[in-house]
A protein has these predicted regions:
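A positional/architectural concept
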Residues: 1-60, 65
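Charge-rich, low-complexity linker and terminal segments
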Residues: 1-8, 79-169
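Short, non-ligating residues that shape and space the ligands of small metal-coordination modules
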Residues: 70-71
Length: 169
């Protein structure tokens, strides 16, 4: 996917660009290419970016370590503010307090928007945090049979004798 020059969006029909996606994203291991659509709309002082996409990934169950396939479905929308001072690095203080409402995605209004990077980030956010092959997954089963009842280490013999003496009383 090519980068979008943000000022060019103002000349597009309805100030919108739609990108059909059917490709493997670098850094995201999927069995199928990411398929979907990204829509980038210039709204004056912000970009409205939305996407519907899906791909199939191979996960490893956190309980039993079995591998299974999982469909990642993305249906998201994000506002990216356009700020001319976003790349200003001169005369910055050593420390700066940032309010919660300032923790927003911003781009320079004369810069570029990279849809492949944005889609990669959104797909990573959509990955399941708890990876379970099924809700009833029992975990790793102990299949070792014939474990002796008596401890192998003779140093535990006195403890076993004490336990037997207590249980007899």
């Amino acid at each position: 996917m090519d980068a979008i020059f943000i000022p060019q969006l103002t000349k597009a029909p309805e100030r919108t660009e739609e990108i059909q996606v059917e490709e493997f994203l670098p850094g995201l291991e999927t069995l199928t290419p990411v398929r979907g659509i990204i829509q980038v709309k210039h709204q004056g002082n912000y970009l409205e970016v939305s996407s519907q996409a899906e791909a199939i990934i191979t996960c490893t169950c956190n309980r039993c370590l079995q591998q299974y396939n999982h469909r990642v479905v993305l249906n998201t929308q994000e506002v990216i503010w356009l700020d001319a001072n976003v790349n200003q690095t001169e005369d910055l203080p050593l420390e700066r307090e940032v309010a919660v409402e300032d923790l927003l995605e911003t781009l320079a209004p004369d810069g570029y928007f990279y849809p492949s990077e944005w889609l990669y980030e959104q797909m990573c956010l959509a990955l399941p945090q708890r990876q379970l092959c099924s809700l009833n997954c029992p975990g790793i089963l102990n299949t070792v049979q014939g474990i002796p009842e008596e401890p192998i280490d003779s140093r535990w013999a006195s403890l076993a004798a004490l336990k037997k003496q207590i249980s007899d009383n």
